[in-house]
Amino acid sequence: DVRIVLPRKSNQRLADFARGAYLREMEDAGCKVLLWQPGMIHAKAGLIDDVAFVGSANFDVRSMLLNFEVDLFVYDVRSVATLESWFLDLLPDCKAGVPRASFIRRLAEGVFRLGAPVL
């Protein structure tokens, strides 16, 4: 079960626009994309089986090679359970699925993909 929770709208309009094609690819691969409706959420955290990670790193080249951001991996059972509970609390305010995109939108997103590594 692979799920990703993102804000429906972030504070970065260009990044919101550029992410559409990637999110649809993730859905096509079987990932459940959940868009959190209430507002901005800037958390960078995840759960993989019984391991959690939290930190400042975005999942992009800039964060890994230019900004030298870092994540903390957490193995403590109670801490992992707390993070899992937080994720589950977000779900009622999420809408599943990436909206369909028109041909023009998909074309524009393709152009934005060229610059995505530096957004």
Positions of predicted regions on the chain:
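PLD/PLD-like phosphodiesterase catalytic module centered on the HKD motif
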Residues: 1-119
